[in-house]
C-alpha cells in the first residue's frame, strides 16, 4: 500500500472526539441512561476516550463496554460473507438505555449491523445510536452514523487506516492507495 496522506493527527483526533462527546450530550439532553459500546478493535478505545471526555464535561461517569465482531472488518480490504459476534461485554444492563455504538471506520455497514444484532440479542435498549471517527462511504446497508468525526469519500481502491495509541502506539488516520 502506498500512503496518500495523513487525514488526522493526534490533536485532530482529540478535537474530533471532544466534538462528538458534546454532540452526544446535546442530542441526548445530558448523559442519563447512556451506555457506550465500542466495536472492537479500535472502536473500544474510542468509546473509552469519549466516555472520559463526557465525564470531564458532565462530571458523571458513562458505562462503557465492547462487542467483538469477527470475520469481517470495515477497515480491511478482505471481506468475508457475514460477520459474526465473538463476544459482548458490558457490566451494566442496557435495558431501556440509550446505547451508542462506537467504531473507527464506517464502510459497508455490515460490522455495525452485526453489532446492532448483538445488542438486541443481549437486551432491549431504548434506542441505538452510532458514532464513528471516519465515514468513508460505500454503504451496502441503509445505516447511517448519528455522530461522524470526518466524512472521507474514498474509492474502493483506497484504504483508511486508523491508528490509536492504545493499540498502535500513535494516533493518526491515514489514507492509502491499495496496490493490487
UniProtKB/Swiss-Prot annotation:
A motif (PRPP-binding) lies at residues 99-111. GO terms for biological process: DNA-templated transcription termination. It is an enzyme of class 2 (transferase). SUPFAM superfamilies: PRTase-like. Its EC number is 2.4.2.9. Signal peptide: none annotated. It comes from the Bacteria. Keywords: Glycosyltransferase, RNA-binding, Transcription, Transcription regulation, Transcription termination, Transferase. Pfam families: Pribosyltran. It catalyses: UMP + diphosphate = 5-phospho-alpha-D-ribose 1-diphosphate + uracil. InterPro entries: PRibTrfase_dom (IPR000836), PRTase-like (IPR029057), PyrR (IPR023050), PyrR_bifunctional (IPR050137). GO terms for molecular function: RNA binding; uracil phosphoribosyltransferase activity. Homodimer and homohexamer; in equilibrium. Belongs to the purine/pyrimidine phosphoribosyltransferase family. PyrR subfamily. Regulates transcriptional attenuation of the pyrimidine nucleotide (pyr) operon by binding in a uridine-dependent manner to specific sites on pyr mRNA. This disrupts an antiterminator hairpin in the RNA and favors formation of a downstream transcription terminator, leading to a reduced expression of downstream genes. Also displays a weak uracil phosphoribosyltransferase activity which is not physiologically significant. This is Bifunctional protein PyrR. It comes from Clostridium botulinum (strain Eklund 17B / Type B).
Amino acid at each position: 500500500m502506498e500512503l496518500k496522506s495523513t487525514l488526522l493527527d493526534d490533536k485532530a483526533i482529540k478535537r474530533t472526539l471532544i466534538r462528538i462527546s458534546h454532540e452526544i450530550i446535546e442530542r441526548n439532553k445530558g448523559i442519563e441512561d447512556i451506555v457506550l459500546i465500542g466495536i472492537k478493535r479500535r472502536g473500544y478505545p474510542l468509546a473509552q476516550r469519549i466516555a472520559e471526555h463526557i465525564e470531564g464535561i458532565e462530571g458523571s461517569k458513562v458505562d462503557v463496554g465492547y462487542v467483538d465482531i469477527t470475520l469481517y472488518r470495515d477497515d480491511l480490504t478482505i471481506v468475508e460473507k457475514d460477520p459474526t459476534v465473538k463476544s459482548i461485554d458490558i457490566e451494566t444492563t442496557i435495558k431501556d438505555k440509550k446505547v451508542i455504538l462506537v467504531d473507527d471506520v464506517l464502510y459497508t455497514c455490515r460490522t455495525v449491523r452485526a453489532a446492532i444484532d448483538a445488542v438486541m440479542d443481549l437486551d432491549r435498549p431504548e434506542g441505538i445510536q452510532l458514532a464513528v471517527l471516519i465515514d468513508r462511504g460505500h454503504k451496502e446497508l441503509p445505516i447511517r452514523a448519528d455522530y461522524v468525526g470526518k466524512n472521507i469519500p474514498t474509492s474502493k481502491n483506497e484504504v483508511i487506516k486508523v491508528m490509536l495509541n492504545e493499540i498502535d502506539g500513535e494516533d493518526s488516520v491515514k489514507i492509502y492507495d491499495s496496490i493490487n
